[in-house]
Amino acid sequence: MRPWPPSPWKDISAYKNLRKELAAGRVYGHLSENLSDFLAQSLLPTTDLVMDRQEKKKQVRFFTNPELCDITEDLVLTEPYLAQPMNPRNKNIVTPGNEDFVREHLYEDEALHAEVAALRNGFMNNAQALIHGDLHSGSIFANEQGIKVIDPEFAFYGPMGYDIGNVIGNLFFAWANKAYTGGSAETQTALEQTIRETCDKTAEKLAAEYDKLVTFPLYCASAFRKAYLDGVMADSYGYAGTEIIRRVVGDSKVIEVTSVTDPAQRLPMERALIDLGIYLIKNRAGGLNGAAVTEEFRKILAEGRGTHGQNG
């Protein structure tokens, strides 16, 4: 088994914060390659499919992280979907002008609540792999040579899709910001391509790692292999959706959103992101891929709508 932490967890002095780089319009050409390499190579080797099962159980105990998991379970997978009195702590921060939109599309959508409940349950009960647990673009440093990852304090054994989804979701913030603040078409195209390639290359590399590392005969059955990998990517798109939504309406927002101070830009941008998040959550099991999710966001942008008429 490969050592943990994986190789990108090293000195970052020659690297720059990915969130800030994307905000400045610098999209590295090999970013999707680097992100997908890290995800595939750090996640699958820590599963029961590859690890010795006794060692895996020891690792699960060692990396039990209840206090920080509580934060995710509350702030990411509960509170963005509930209003008072069901949400007594009420940490959501909804931009004035979007209150009715949030109430209708997040607080009152029972079908969405059922899907988020499934994702929350998976986060709490699927000790699938050792995950970073907070893998947003502020925890990634990059340059033309590669990436480095920091801040693993949320690490625990959870669903692989949570890390993958956090990466995908945070890339969309950069695209949304550029789309609503007059960013160049070239930058927007580069961001779209990076998202599409990150989605698809991650799926491809997970499959390649699976074929290389998994040797247990039952796990090598083609139907199981397909179901397992499809499940990981379905989780990934779902958690991308919950990450997007929580960064818009929750109390831990991202600079790509908060830096937009003109309500004429901020309000529709937030609605578009919420709209995308709902789409990803509700359609996660429908065989999504990079082309499908970027095409969906292009539709949202092209129509200039504050509400996506058919969320699901």
Q: What spans do the regions from the language model cover?
A:
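ATP-dependent phospho-/nucleotidyl transfer catalytic cores
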Residues: 16-132, 143, 261
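Conserved catalytic-loop position in the HRD/HxD motif
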Residues: 134, 139, 151
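Long, amphipathic alpha-helical stalk/connector segments used for oligomerization, subunit docking
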Residues: 218-220
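ATP/Mg2+ or Mg2+-diphosphate-binding catalytic cores
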Residues: 222-312
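Activation segment
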Residues: 147, 155-157, 254
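Pre-DFG segment of protein kinase catalytic domains
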Residues: 130, 148-151
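Active-site activation/catalytic loop segments of kinase-like enzymes and analogous catalytic loops
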Residues: 161-215, 240-257
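Conserved short submotifs of the Hanks-type protein kinase catalytic core
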Residues: 2-14
